[in-house]
């Protein structure tokens, strides 16, 4: 236990919590340009070809972003919007691509959870 005199000389410092998505710099979303669009395999015990994109953000950061949903139209030089949110079985992927914003098209023929995939309401 510190004495009052010690605390007067050197007060207690509060712990600084580290952000899980530092590249966003306290913004809800960030715009960026795809530098590479590719597939990668998840950690054990899962097996798939997950679609990801390497993105150069407007603030200079280069991050990896997951592309959710079935099928996408992204390629190199596509301008996309990313949000926070990691993918548990892909190490180093801490961002999600926002579907239906900028150059990234929404998922076609999506019926449920449409707002998460940028899909308009179907007719009928």
From Swiss-Prot:
InterPro entries, sorted: NA-bd_OB-fold, Ribosomal_uS12, Ribosomal_uS12_bac
Record flagged with keyword Ribosomal protein: yes
A GO MF term: tRNA binding
Pfam families: Ribosom_S12_S23
Keyword set includes Lipid metabolism: no
CDD domains referenced in this protein's UniProt entry, alphabetically: Ribosomal_S12
GO cellular component, one term: small ribosomal subunit
Gene3D superfamilies associated with the record: Nucleic acid-binding proteins
Keywords: Methylation, Ribonucleoprotein, Ribosomal protein, RNA-binding, rRNA-binding, tRNA-binding
Residues recorded with modification 3-methylthioaspartic acid: 89
Region listing for Disordered, in residue ranges: 1-23
A single GO BP: translation
Matches recorded under SUPFAM superfamilies: Nucleic acid-binding proteins (SSF50249)
Subunit (UniProt): Part of the 30S ribosomal subunit. Contacts proteins S8 and S17. May interact with IF1 in the 30S initiation complex.
Homology family: Belongs to the universal ribosomal protein uS12 family.
Function as written in the Swiss-Prot or TrEMBL entry: With S4 and S5 plays an important role in translational accuracy. Interacts with and stabilizes bases of the 16S rRNA that are involved in tRNA selection in the A site and with the mRNA backbone. Located at the interface of the 30S and 50S subunits, it traverses the body of the 30S subunit contacting proteins on the other side and probably holding the rRNA structure together. The combined cluster of proteins S8, S12 and S17 appears to hold together the shoulder and platform of the 30S subunit.
HAMAP family (alphabetical): Ribosomal_uS12_B
Protein name, entry field: Small ribosomal subunit protein uS12
């Amino acid at each position: 236990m510190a004495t009052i005199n010690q605390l007067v000389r050197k007060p207690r410092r509060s712990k600084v919590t580290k952000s899980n998505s530092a590249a966003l710099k306290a913004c809800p979303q960030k715009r960026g340009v795809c530098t590479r669009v590719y597939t990668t395999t998840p950690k054990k015990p899962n097996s798939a070809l997950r679609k990801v994109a390497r993105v150069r953000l407007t603030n200079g950061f280069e991050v990896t972003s997951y592309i959710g949903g079935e099928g996408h139209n992204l390629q190199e030089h596509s301008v996309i919007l990313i949000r926070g949110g990691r993918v548990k079985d892909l190490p180093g992927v801490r961002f999600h691509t926002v579907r239906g914003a900028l150059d990234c098209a929404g998922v076609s023929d999506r019926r449920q959870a449409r707002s998460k995939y940028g899909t308009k309401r179907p007719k009928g």
